[in-house]
C-alpha cells in the first residue's frame, strides 16, 4: 500500500448517480443518473482529489465508456418494486440472536464475528467485522443499493425470518468503505455463514436502506446481522471455505454502484487470494442490523468478474472497490455476453494515451519507488483517456532490480536493450513512438519522459503530421529543439520532488541458531565438531561451540537452519543419534537424564522437530498440550511452558514483535496467554483448574492468527478474565536485558542487575537463548519499566551527503510506518559520524522498527538501527555511586538540580534521567527550595574523603577499561628511618609547604639501575622525602642544583625510569615504588610500563592538549601550580573554567589528565610539568621536523644544537624535555621512527629509509585521490588529524593500512602527497586541509553543483553565500581563499563561472565548457605524431597544437585553470612530470606508447584496418619485438586492444574480426617528423611527399581546387580530369571488405548536371597523393610548387594498387573510403560522392 494516499476521501462530493429528482417516485431507479456529469460535481475541499484521479483500484479500468456517449441510451430507467410493500414488522429479539453455522466452519461460539467485504488486486477490497446482534432498520433519506455478485453463498435466512428491519445509520463515519452484498448463483449443500459486504463511503447524509428479497438462482435471501460501524481498530476473522466452493461461483445480479461510468469487465472467475487478503476497515458494533434492499426485477446476467488482474495493484481501505456492471432485461450467457462488446466499443471512443519513458535519461531517484512514479504519471495524465501504451526501455541487467520489479508489478512494459550499443534505448523508443502513431489516430496523447534531443524529429512528426497532443517530461538541461515540439512541458525534477522512499522488499538477513543434543561425551570436541560440520556444511552451518553433550550451530538464515534440521535429525554421530532443535534445553538435561522431573520435560524428537519460533504458535502448542494432558503434574505443565516458548535469538524477538507490533497491547496480551503458576517458584507451583481451562480459547485464538487483521480487539470474556489473573513475563538475552521490566527467577540467572553489554542489532557471537521465564507479578514493583516514557532507537551510518532537513523527514517517514514517532534528533554534522535518535512511543514499535529498518537504505547508505537504552540501562547501584562522587565534592554535599545534571553529564559522558534520582531513596534526597530543586547527599551516605583527594598513580592495570587508576597506599612511614639524615623527623610537625623539590643532573642510563637496586634493598618502597639520603647512602654523592640551572626535578626524573612510579599513601606521603610491586622483566617494552591515554570525555582530551601547549612554552616545562590559572588565561586568552569539565576543584581537573601532566612536590608549592611519556612524544615530533628540514634527512649529534637552533629559532636545552642528556631521550624513540648510525667516527641521527616499490607508489597516488574525495565532503575542506582514520574507514568502507603504501606512520604518508594535502599544526592539534590548488578545484566543483541546481544555471551574487550555506551545511569563508570579496573570488574561478551585469544586479553564471573529448583526441594525435624525445614540454605541446589547428588553446574553456591540470585529468593517457630544468613535461603512458605503434602499423594498411588474428604477427614484424599483453596488465591481445578505445576498435565476429583505426587517429601531420619505420620509403630529391592535415575524418578530398571558393555542393563532388587513367569504379575491392551496394543519396542538390564530368585545364597546383603504405611513388611535375587543400580535406589512402605511370605529366587520383563507422561515437557520414551521386555502403554488417 502506498503511503500518503490513505487520507483520500472518494466521497467528498455528492454522487450524481445516487441522487434522485424530487418529484421521482422512491421506487424508481433512474439509470440516467448513474453517470457523473460536470454540472453534478460539487465544490470539494482541496485535500481531496477527483474520483477519476485515484488510480488505486483493484482492477485497472481500461474499458470505461464516455459519460456523454453512454448515458441513458444503454440503460433505460427500470422500475423498482414498492419498498413499502417489502417492509417487515418490527419484532423485538434477544440481545444475542442465534446464528446457525455451516458444517464446514470451525466449531466456534455463536458469537464468533463474521467478515463482510472483500476485494481484489491485493488489498483493494475492504472488509468489516460484523458481530451478531439486533437487526438493522433504516429511516434515512438517501438510497444505496447493494451489489449481488460472485462471492460466498449466503446463510439461509430461516433463523432470521423474524428479524427487525429498522435502524439508524447516522453514526457512520464519512469515510466508511463501500459495501455490496454478494450471493451465489449455484446452490450449495453447505453454505458459509456469511458473505462479503462492501460499504460505499457516505457523505454527511446517510443513505436509505431497503430490504433485500429473494433472488433468482439463489436458495434464499439472507438477513445479515451487523453491529455498529465505528472507526476503531480494524480487524477480521476469516471464514473457512473449501476450494471447491470457491471456483464455480459466478456473478448473478450486479448493480453498478462505484464506477463512473459503468463498466462491463471481461472474464469469468476470481482468485481466492484476492478475497482472502485482509483489509482494513471499521468495526461494526453489535447494536445495529443491516436492512434488506430490493434490487431491480431483472433477469440475471452471469458475468463473472475477475477480481485479480495480476498486477499486484494495491488500494487503501478508504478507496472505492471493484464493482460489477450488469445487463438489464437480457438473457444470461456464461461467457462473452453482448454487454462486454458494447462496453468495449464505448471505451474505444476515449482518446488513447501512450507513455514512453527513457528511464536511463530520467531515472528513478535512488531510494525512491518506481511504483510511485508510475502512479503519479497515471494520475496526472490519464484522466479522460484510455491507456494504450506504457513502455520504458533500459538494460535490465544494469538497472536496479527493485525498480524493474516495481515496473513489472505496475504493468509497465519493460523493453530490454543492450546498454553498450549506441543509442539503443533511443532507437527503441523512437520505434515505439512510430508504431504508436501508425496504430492510433488523433485525438491521442503522447507522454515522453526524456531529455534526449534525439526525439525531436519524432515529436515534431507526431505533433504536426499526426496531430497528437505531446506532453514532455524533461530535466532542466533539455534542449530548446526538443522543448519546441511539445504542447506541455513538465520538469522531471519537480514531478518527482516529493516521492516516498521505496519500502524494503525483503527482511534483513539475520543469523539463526540450531541446538544439537545427545552428542557423545567420550569423544574429543574436535572430532565431534568435524562430524557436525560435515553434516551441516551443505546448508552453510558453522559450529559455534560444543559443551558436554550439546552443541550450537549457526546458519545464515532461517531456511538454511530448517533444511539442516531435517537433514541432521537422528543422524549418527559416533554411535549416538543426535537431537536437533531450534530451542535450547535446560542445562540439567545433559547432566541428569535419569531424573524423573527432567524426563517429563524432554520431548520426543518428533515433537521437537519443527518449532516455528513464533510467540503465537508456541503459545498454542503449550496450551494444546495442556489441554490434551490436564491430569499431569505441575512439572509437566511448567516444563512445557518454559520449553515450548523458547526462542533462539534476538532476531526472533524482533521478528515476532514486528509481526504483532501493529496490534495494540490488549490484543497482544489476549493472544499471548501462557499457563503459568501463581507462585514465583515454578517447580513447586501447582496449576489451578482455572488456568488449565484457559487453554481452549487460547488455542482457538492462536489457531486463527493468520486471519487477524491489525489492531483488532476481539478477546473473549474468558480471555479478558485470564488477563487479570495471569502474568506473562519475558526474559530477554543479555543484549536485551535492559529492556525488561521483570526480574529473572531462574536459579541460573540469579543476578538482579542488568547487563552492561552494549546493544547490537546482530548478535552473531551470542548464543543466549530467549526464554519466557515464569515470574511473580510482585517483581514488577522492584523493577519498574525503563521504557515507560518511550523507547529510543539509535540510527547510525547515515548518509551525510543529504541535508539535515531531508534526513529528518526520511527518518520520520520510515519509522512512522512502524508506530508513533515522538521525536527525531540528529547529532552534529561532523567527521562523518552523523547519528540520529528516534524516540518511539512504546517498546514494541521500537523493536519492530529495529527489525524492519536495520540496513534499510536511505540515500546512498544502509542505516544501522539499534535500540538505545540511555540512562535507563544504568543500574541503580552504579547511579548511586556516580551520584555520590559528584555530591561529595559539592559544598555541604548539595547542588541545585540543574547544576548537578550539568556536572554529571559532563563528567560521565551520558544523559541523566532525573526520575532515576527519586529511586535513590537511601542515597540522596531531592528537596524543593526557592525556584528550583536541590539534590542533597544523605548523611548516611557521606563517605569519609581521603585527605589527599584522588591522588594519581600510573598503574598499568584498571578495572574501568582505562590504564589510569588513582592508587592510594596504606599508611607509610614518611621517611626511611635507616638512611634519613634528620633522625628527629616528626610527621605531625612536618609542614608540606616547607618541602623543596630537588633538581638533579644525572644520566638516566646510569640512574635507572640504581633506582631498581635501591628499591630492591628497601623492600620495594622508598619514601620520596628520604630518597636523596638513601641514594647517597647507597651510591655516593647526588649532584643537586638550583632551579633553572640545568637540572631536572628529581621526582620527575624518577618517573622516567621504566617500571617505577610514585604513589601517594593515605597519610599524604609520596612513595617511590614499582608499578606492579615487583621489578619489571628484563625484556619488557618500556612503553608498556607507561601510563596510557584514558578513553573518556573529549573535553578532557582537548584540555590535555592545551596543557601540553601551555607547558612547553614555560622554562624547562615547569610551572608552579599557583601560576597555572593566570598563565592559562594569558596563553589562550580565555578563562579555565573547572566546572566546564565536570569538576569543582582545579586539583581534580589536573589529576584527571595524568597521562600528560605530573604534579610535583606537596603543599602549596607544588609544580606542574609534563610526564615523561608526553615529553618523549613531543621530542619525537620536534626531532622528525628537524631531520626533515635537513637536505640529507640526517643530523650529526655534534651539530645537533646548531641544527636545532636553525630549525626552531631557539637554543637547544635538553632539560626542556625532562632529561639531562640527549641520548637519554633519543634512546626512548622506537627504531622504526629514527635510527642511530656511526659514520666517520660521528654519531648520526637519521630517518630510516625504505625504498618503496612501484606498486606502493601507485597506491600512494590513488590514496591522494581518496584524500581529496574525503576532504571534499568535510566543512571547509579540512578535518582534525585524529579523525582521519575513522572517517576514511567510514567513507570508503575499508581500513587505511599504512603498510599498503610503504609507510609506518600516517604523518609520513601525508608528507608523501604534498601536492594534495597540508598538515597544519594548531598547538598540539593537527589539522588536515587540501592544498590551495585542490581547494580551488573542490570549490569549483561546489559552484558547479550549486549553479546547476539553480534556474538557468545562474545566481545573484548577493544570494551566493546564503545558498552556499543552505546547500552544503556550513558558511563560506572568504579568508580561506585569500580573497576579501566574492568578485575577487570569481576572478580566481574564471574557468568555471562568470559575472554578468543585469538590471537587478550582478549575476554569477555558469560558463559553457567545450567538449574535452575532441580536445583529448587532438592532443593524443599530436603526442603520437611526435617523434623527437620521449617527452614533450607542456608549453611545446601548446605551441604545436595552436600551430596545427590555428586555434588558441585556452584551458579555461574546458574547465581547467592551466593546461597542466587538464593533462593531469587524463592519467590513463599521459603522464605529467617535472624535468631537471623544473619544466612541466608530458609523455604518453606505456599503454599509449603501444597505442602509438598500433596507429603507425595500421597506417600502413588498406583502410587502416587488419584482421585480428593477423595483428600479433604484423605488430611483431613492424615493431621488432614480440607483443606481450601481460606487460600492460592484460591477459590477451583482444583485451589489450580494447583498453585503447580512443585509438582502435574491433568489429565483426569470430575469425572475421577486424582491428580498425579510429577516424580521429587517421590524420598524419606534416609539421611533425615522420615515423622511423617509413624513413626508408621516402621519395627521391626530385619528388616531394606532402601530407594534408585534416580537421575531421568525414571530409573528402577535392583535387584541383582553384583560388575561387566553390560552393559546398561542388566541394562534395569528386571531379576527375579527362586524362586520368584511373577508373575508380572498376578497381578491384580488397577481399576483407564486404560487397558494396549502390543507393541514392538523399542529399538534395542544386539544379545541376550531376553526371557531367567537366573538363578543366590542369594547373600547376594540382597534385597527386602518395600512398606510402603501398610503397607507390607518384612523381609531381617540377612546376607543381604548391599544394592547395581545403581545411576540411583529409589525407586519403588509395584503396587499390595503381599501375606504373608511363608519363610524368599524368596525374592520378587515389581514393580511400572507410566503410565502417565506430560504434562508440556517431561520426558524420563519410561517403564518396560519385558522378551519379551514389554512395558506397556495406550490404551486411560483420
Curated annotation (Swiss-Prot):
- List residues modified as Phosphotyrosine: 699
**CDD domains documented for this protein:** LOTUS_1_Limkain_b1, LOTUS_2_Limkain_b1, LOTUS_3_Limkain_b1, LOTUS_4_Limkain_b1, LOTUS_5_Limkain_b1, LOTUS_6_Limkain_b1, LOTUS_7_Limkain_b1, LOTUS_8_Limkain_b1
Q: Which PROSITE patterns would you find in this protein's record?
A: HTH_OST, RRM
A Gene Ontology molecular function term for this protein is: RNA binding
Which Cys-Cys disulphide bridges does the record give? none
Q: Where is this region: Disordered?
A: 619-646, 681-717, 1677-1726
Q: Which UniProt keywords apply?
A: Differentiation, Meiosis, Oogenesis, Peroxisome, Phosphoprotein, Repeat, RNA-binding
State a single Pfam family of this protein. Answer: OST-HTH
- Gene3D superfamilies referenced in this protein's UniProt entry, alphabetically: 3.30.70.330, 5'-nuclease (3.40.50.1010), LOTUS domain-like (3.30.420.610)
Record has Cell inner membrane as a keyword: no
Q: Where is the RRM domain?
A: 791-870
> Which stretches does UniProt call biased (Low complexity)?
1679-1696
Polar residues bias located where?
621-646, 681-691
Q: Which GO terms describe its biological process?
A: double-strand break repair; female meiotic nuclear division; oogenesis; regulation of gene expression
Q: Which residues form the signal peptide?
A: none
Instruction: Report the GO terms under cellular component.
Output: cytoplasm; Golgi apparatus; intracellular membrane-bounded organelle; membrane; peroxisome
UniProt subcellular location: Peroxisome
The entry's protein name is Meiosis regulator and mRNA stability factor 1
The organism of origin for this protein:
Homo sapiens
Lineage start: Eukaryota, Metazoa, Chordata, Craniata, Vertebrata
As recorded in Swiss-Prot or TrEMBL, the protein's gene is named MARF1
